[in-house]
From Swiss-Prot:
It is an enzyme of class 6 (ligase). The FACS motif is required for catalytic activity and substrate specificity. It comes from Saccharomyces cerevisiae (strain ATCC 204508 / S288c). One of its GO terms (molecular function) is acid-ammonia (or amide) ligase activity. This is Acetyl-coenzyme A synthetase 1.
């Protein structure tokens, strides 16, 4: 064959290969489009799961007097309409009915001068009223049902639990309130830092602080000393309350040592109250600064009156990470927050006073504040306080607790459910779980397959799952199904707005409301509600810039959402988790899902980074399964893995979504609640490793250096 013929043959072969590649790309694009259409179809027509009659699940003793608080979906729709159209009537009547006031309020809210609706700019509720949070949580129940269980405690080790009645709780709280007042000099309006594990004394502490009109600032008892120091100083805390040590998952945590380290740089702190949990004599005690819980309590009587506070007086600060990385001290008022906690307890979970409410959350987060402490005690039921973890001493611990204490409502994060699902169903066997009447999910959207496992294995496909969407800033639920036979459920959807929440989906670019049959944009709320946070401590400008200024007239949640043809709301994740590549808006969650489907992948986090050609490009941080077996892989083998994962995305979604970078790492930067901090990944990719902001919420701060080194490689 002549050279020209050979060249011609090669060109034909290349042309053929190009045609094949084009055909594959076209097929891939078509597949991606089909997948999108399929996902749209799923979103808009996923099977609705009706709630079964609840009374069939009740114990006979409860079934004799139980009836749901709402009479089906139409009753919810009627009341929700009233709460939006006449919030003064709705919330005024509820506040009068469910809260005890030392001085009645004379105005429900301050109306917006333009709309007449509750104002974001002047958000104040139940004006000129006075009340006390502790009285509403403890005293009124101790007077009526003194011997009723208020707190059921389950220690880290099985068999270490005990119960506290409302009468006993009142006496304990009154003594600690006097310790704060007379031994420690705390006054109304002072801030008290709390660094305690999940023990009854932590709940007693919060109630004692609120009893004297002070402000509690709980710091999760897993934060480092530096993080604790920063929160003590920012919150202007005068005293700190802690334990000598704590127990979790069979391990001893040196709580007091962390406090001592933090207090080296906290000039405003006068005293530390120490509850000796383990009585370890080697734990340092610095008198006269440090005071012993038991010794001080003995000095005081078992009753001490409440201090009335104004409706808008601060109840607590709770620090949450912001998009800039600097923690925000979110400030909640007293009356509005209490009403939000109580109403969601009543209607979301269909709670009754005979119930045993188990929230598997920590008081260091908003879930613990609202649904371990305030919600259950406001309602007068029993709250179950669990010190341990779902995996210790084995994966049946939650189910053991539910059966032993006849728990009626169980509220937990999908992170824990995924762990328990992975552990296997054998740990659920031999458990009745018949006391359960409602299952809850909190903290992140729950995947449909986890929802279905939760429903089938724990709920026996007989009881509702309330997939709740809310935030530290909201104080209580924003979007949620309602138990008690009210809301037909769609697995993966948070369903409908709670009372008083006028939830809308906005076009992220124009800020206009989207009212189509399938609206997808950013989730916002159109008017204020009682439990909405009032400000960021000492930084109201940041409060405005973060929540109210992005879309004037709305509260900006920071989350993307879709509303389907039936009005169900689907939470799509943070709006900063969207990558714009060559004009294509790509959901990082969608790309992550494609990668995670591969059997060699354990975890994945996708973020965007700047690209000169496409504006943004996609980077995927990937954790492989069986990491030990990959540690000896050659560079060529690792490159093959990366190419394979890129091809997976191209195949599942389309070429436009293919990651430009695949970075293999040992772990991802996660908070202690299991959320991936993608902000850190974005900063590292942008070459801003020295501007990571607050990384104290990471469960493994040491992973940051590994991630930086992996990107450099």
């Amino acid at each position: 064959m002549s050279p020209s013929a050979v060249q011609s043959s090669k060109l034909e072969e290349q042309s053929s290969e190009i045609d094949k590649l084009k055909a594959k790309m076209s097929q891939s694009a078509a597949t991606a489009q089909q997948k999108k259409e399929h996902e749209y179809e799923h979103l808009t027509s996923v099977k609705i799961v009706p709630q079964r009659p609840i009374s069939d699940r009740l114990q006979p003793a409860i079934a004799t007097h139980y009836s749901p608080h709402l009479d089906g979906l139409q009753d919810y729709q009627r009341l929700h309409k009233e709460s939006i159209e006449d919030p003064a009537k709705f919330f005024g009547s509820k506040a009068t009915q469910f809260l005890n006031w030392s001085k009645p309020f004379d105005k429900v809210f301050i109306p917006d001068p333009k709309t007449g609706r509750p104002s974001f700019q002047n958000n104040a509720w139940f004006l000129n009223g006075q009340l006390n949070a502790c009285y509403n949580c403890v005293d009124r129940h101790a007077l009526k049902t003194p011997n009723k269980k208020a707190i059921i405690f389950e220690g880290d080790e099985p068999g270490q639990g005990y119960s506290i009645t409302y009468k006993e709780l009142l006496e304990e709280v009154c003594q600690v309130a006097q310790v704060l007042t007379y031994s420690m000099g705390v006054r109304k309006g002072d801030t008290v830092a709390v660094y305690m594990p999940m023990v009854p004394e932590a709940i007693i502490t919060l109630l004692a602080i609120s009893r004297i009109g002070a402000i509690h600032s709980v710091v999760f008892a897993g934060f480092s000393s530096n993080s604790l120091r920063d929160r003590i100083n920012d919150g202007d805390s005068k005293v700190v309350i802690t334990t000598d040590e704590s127990n979790r998952g069979g391990k001893v945590i040196e709580t007091k040592r962390i406090v001592d380290d933090a207090l080296r740089e906290t000039p405003g702190v006068r005293h530390v109250l120490v509850y000796r949990k383990t009585n370890n004599p080697s734990v340092a005690f610095h008198a006269p600064r440090d005071l012993d819980w038991a010794t001080e309590k003995k000095k005081y009587k078992t009753y001490y009156p409440c201090t009335p506070v104004d409706s808008e007086d601060p109840l607590f600060l709770l620090y949450t990470s912001g998009s800039t990385g600097a923690p925000k001290g979110v400030q909640h008022s007293t009356a509005g927050y209490l009403l939000g906690a109580l109403l969601t307890m009543r209607y979301t979970f269909d709670t009754h006073q005979e119930d045993v409410f188990f929230t598997a959350g920590d008081i260091g987060w908003i879930t613990g504040h609202t649904y371990v402490v305030y919600g259950p005690l406001l309602y007068g039921c029993a709250t179950l306080v669990f010190e341990g973890t779902p995996a210790y001493p084995n994966y049946s611990r939650y189910w053991d607790i539910i059966d032993e204490h006849k728990v009626t409502q169980f509220y937990v994060a999908p992170t824990a459910l995924r762990l328990l699902k992975r552990a296997g169903d054998s740990y659920i066997e031999n458990h009745s779980l018949k006391s359960l009447r409602c299952l809850g999910s909190v903290g992140e959207p729950i995947a449909a397959e986890v929802w279905e496992w939760y429903s089938e294995k724990i709920g026996k496909n007989e009881i509702p799952i309330v997939d709740t969407y809310w935030q530290t800033e909201s104080g209580s639920h924003l979007v949620t199904p309602l138990a008690g036979g009210v809301t037909p459920m769609k697995p993966g959807s948070a369903s409908f707005p709670f009372f008083g929440i006028d939830a809308v989906v906005l076009d992220p670019n124009t800020g206009e409301e989207l009212n189509t049959s399938h609206a997808e944009g950013v989730l916002a709320v159109k008017a204020a509600w009682p439990s909405f946070a009032r400000t960021i401590w000492k930084n109201h400008d940041r409060y405005l810039d973060t929540y109210l200024n992005p879309y004037p007239g709305y509260y900006f949640t920071g989350d993307g959402a879709a509303k389907d043809k039936d009005g169900y709301i689907w939470i799509l994740g943070r709006v900063d988790d969207v990558v714009n590549v060559s004009g294509h808006r790509l959901s990082t969650a969608e790309i992550e899902a494609a990668i995670i489907e591969d059997p060699i992948v354990a975890e994945c986090a996708v973020v965007g980074f700047n690209d000169d050609l496409t504006g943004q490009a996609v980077a995927a941080f990937v954790v492989l399964k069986n990491k030990s077996s990959w540690s000896t892989a050659t560079d060529d083998e690792l490159q093959d893995i990366k190419k394979h994962l890129v091809f997976t995305v191209r195949k599942d979604i389309g070429p436009f979504a293919a990651p430009k970078l695949i970075i293999l790492v040992d772990d991802l930067p996660k908070t202690r609640s299991g959320k991936i901090m993608r902000r850190i990944l974005r900063k590292i990719l942008a070459g801003e490793s020295d501007q990571l902001g607050d990384v104290s919420t990471l469960s493994n701060p040491g992973i940051v250096r590994h991630l930086i080194d992996s990107v450099k490689l």
